[in-house]
A protein has these predicted regions:
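Core segments of cupin and vicinal oxygen chelate
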Residues: 11-12, 22-70
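Hydrophobic pocket/interface hotspot
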Residues: 30, 34, 89, 106
Length: 161
């Protein structure tokens, strides 16, 4: 994290992911959720060719690009790896304090039950968006090697209250 991968000479090839695209049943409801919880900013909201889509900026270099398409519903209630081509995304909290605040907001929205998993190099919580899409919020612990806690057997539930 934070280092470029596979440079050509001294040329960095990528900065980050520009956006993630997925289907929503109700774009207005989804926008409101991300605005309330993450302080998101809508930079594009378009209706064209029988569909509606938006760019929802949830953080620096982090844009969600959901589409509302009539007659097309997102998968609901599917287990991990059965949700389609995009199973989930993980949003990276700016700090431990930000992680705790976002956890509080997600619990208040009913999008998370408050449980947090310590995965060694990061804290992780799962949340559901208004379409029941399962996503994650993580906080990467400074100075902890990324390989720490990679095995599920090493993970533990932690109480942040």
């Amino acid at each position: 994290m934070g280092q470029s991968i596979a440079p050509i000479g001294s040329v960095q090839l990528l900065n980050d992911i520009h956006h993630l695209t997925f289907i929503t049943a109700d774009l207005g409801r989804l926008i409101t959720f991300y605005q309330r919880v993450f302080g998101a900013r809508v930079t594009v909201d378009l209706e064209e060719e029988g569909l509606r889509h938006a760019f929802i900026e949830v953080g620096p270099h982090t844009v969600l690009h959901p589409f509302q398409v009539p007659g097309l519903e997102p998968p609901v209630g599917q287990p991990m790896f059965h949700r389609g081509r995009l199973d989930h995304f993980a949003l990276n909290a700016a700090s431990e304090e930000a992680f705790r605040e976002l956890r509080r907001r997600l619990v208040a929205e009913g999008a998370n039950d408050g449980r947090v998993t310590d995965m060694g190099s990061l804290l992780n919580l799962s949340f559901a968006d208004p379409d029941q899409g399962r996503h994650e919020l993580v906080w990467v612990k400074p100075g902890v090697p990324v390989a720490a806690g990679l095995k599920r057997a090493e993970w533990k539930m932690v109480d942040l209250d």
